[in-house]
Amino acid sequence: MNRIQQTFAALAEQGRKGLIPFITAGDPDPAKTVEFMHALAEGGADVIELGVPFSDPMADGPVIQRSSERALARGVTLKSVLADVKRFRDTNQTTPVVLMGYANPIERMGVDAFATEAQAAGVDGVLVVDYPPEEAGVFAEKMRAAQIDPIFLLAPTSTDERIADVGKIASGYVYYVSLKGVTGAGNLDVSSIAGKIPAIKSRVPVPVGVGFGIRDAETARAVAEVSDAVVIGSRLVQLLESAAPEGAAAALKTFIAELRAALDGAGKTAR
């Protein structure tokens, strides 16, 4: 089993739910990214999603768009993100890291070169927002050949056919976008999430993480009751946007620890 599979197997055995925080690599300071990754892990993150900044992040709301713009302005590239993962791996060999981003930077590097470099850096999974599953079969095969899990998005509008397509090629976990629209938008309707998850789990043989609209311990716990993992991003990016530079890592760790405690309570309730 790879790191993602080991993580979810351990969570299932312990009756706990996964916590998957997202930050944008290089924001607000490229020199702080690895420190922030360690803060997430120390706070209780099970998997870290590391955003690769892109100039046209179509699925992201204004908070993450701004973070991408700041990172790009500071010279962050796919290569520098891979270097961050490699530095993180110098002292953390256990926490899975998933790169989340768009196809263009990967295609500019070349899919084969990306697979080789990502594997060497210690990347465990990759979620490419604009690779629909019906067109991503070859990409998914190349990622798996490099021991990297191809992770795909599902949404409230996903048909049973689309869910089945994802089920055929996904590994690691799937990311269920709980709201229509962009990241950081709207209010959660946990009952609608609960209604969709069984259809996903009947067709997809990997854990289901739920994201978009999760902002605090209360919403995280509610979503954890009906899913395998909770993904939180925009709230963390906002936290880093507003925190004093010298206290940002500590604030991140504290916030993640609060979510971890809430999720552990949800896991115990669910058993």
From Swiss-Prot:
<keyword id="KW-0822">Tryptophan biosynthesis</keyword>
<keyword id="KW-0028">Amino-acid biosynthesis</keyword>
<dbReference type="InterPro" id="IPR018204">
    <property type="entry name" value="Trp_synthase_alpha_AS"/>
</dbReference>
<dbReference type="InterPro" id="IPR002028">
    <property type="entry name" value="Trp_synthase_suA"/>
</dbReference>
<protein>
    <recommendedName>
        <fullName>Tryptophan synthase alpha chain</fullName>
        <ecNumber>4.2.1.20</ecNumber>
    </recommendedName>
</protein>
<feature type="active site" description="Proton acceptor">
    <location>
        <position position="60"/>
    </location>
</feature>
<dbReference type="GO" id="GO:0004834">
    <property type="term" value="F:tryptophan synthase activity"/>
</dbReference>
<comment type="function">
    <text>The alpha subunit is responsible for the aldol cleavage of indoleglycerol phosphate to indole and glyceraldehyde 3-phosphate.</text>
</comment>
<dbReference type="InterPro" id="IPR011060">
    <property type="entry name" value="RibuloseP-bd_barrel"/>
</dbReference>
<dbReference type="InterPro" id="IPR013785">
    <property type="entry name" value="Aldolase_TIM"/>
</dbReference>
<comment type="subunit">
    <text>Tetramer of two alpha and two beta chains.</text>
</comment>
<dbReference type="Pfam" id="PF00290">
    <property type="entry name" value="Trp_syntA"/>
</dbReference>
<dbReference type="GO" id="GO:0005829">
    <property type="term" value="C:cytosol"/>
</dbReference>
<comment type="pathway">
    <text>Amino-acid biosynthesis; L-tryptophan biosynthesis; L-tryptophan from chorismate: step 5/5.</text>
</comment>
<feature type="active site" description="Proton acceptor">
    <location>
        <position position="49"/>
    </location>
</feature>
<comment type="similarity">
    <text>Belongs to the TrpA family.</text>
</comment>
<keyword id="KW-0456">Lyase</keyword>
<keyword id="KW-0057">Aromatic amino acid biosynthesis</keyword>
